[in-house]
A protein has these predicted regions:
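Active-site-adjacent betaalpha module
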Residues: 1-5, 24, 28-36, 53-161
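Glycine/Thr-rich phosphate-binding loops of Rossmann-like dinucleotide-binding domains
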Residues: 17, 50-51
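Short hydrophobic beta-strand that contains or immediately precedes a catalytic carboxylate
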Residues: 8-9
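Catalytic metal-binding/acid-base residues of hydrolase active sites
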Residues: 12, 46-47, 107, 133
Length: 161
């Protein structure tokens, strides 16, 4: 395996229905990563706040979306926006000497944003797959792509992989 990972963030049953518009591209990115011996990682969000209505642990809403291809057991859970706050994921990154990431998933203005910001702050190479991310507010995606680029991320459409 290469020292690279495709990280699919929060494509779960409770995420915005807008994910259905990019799930085909996300699945194509998963196929690409597998074909190129790139680790495929799935990040799940669990909301630990009292009284939460979404992403509750051990509920259908917290499960990965059924129309997403699952090609590895690299499934990590986080309770904060930044995927690197998952100790299990951070350990996986270190154990596999991963230094370059391809990012897909949701939400572009929250968990994707926090994850790519913190990956760049840690000097990792980060490539955001522009047609593999979504948001509750799709109008903000272009703004987020500019933000990611301003932080040193490469912005690439799936067809340019």
């Amino acid at each position: 395996m290469q020292k690279k990972a495709l990280v699919v963030i929060d494509i779960q049953n409770d995420i915005t229905k807008n994910y259905k518009e990019v799930i085909g591209n996300i699945n194509a990115a998963i196929d690409w990563a597998k074909a190129h011996e790139i680790h495929v990682v799935y990040i799940r969000h669990e909301n630990l706040s009292a009284g939460t209505r979404t992403f509750k642990p051990n509920t259908r809403g917290a499960e990965l979306a059924p129309d997403m291809k699952i090609v590895s057991d690299n499934i990590f859970t986080k309770s904060k926006e930044n995927a690197l706050t998952s100790e299990a994921f951070a350990t996986f990154v270190r154990a596999n000497a991963i230094d370059e990431f391809y990012i897909a998933g949701a939400d572009a203005v929250a968990c994707v944003k926090s994850t790519v910001f913190n990956m760049r702050a840690a000097n990792y190479g980060v490539h955001v797959l522009s047609d593999c991310i979504t948001s509750y507010d799709k109008r903000k995606i272009d703004e987020m792509l500019r933000y990611y680029e301003s932080k040193g991320c490469d912005i690439i459409p799936l067809e340019n992989l």
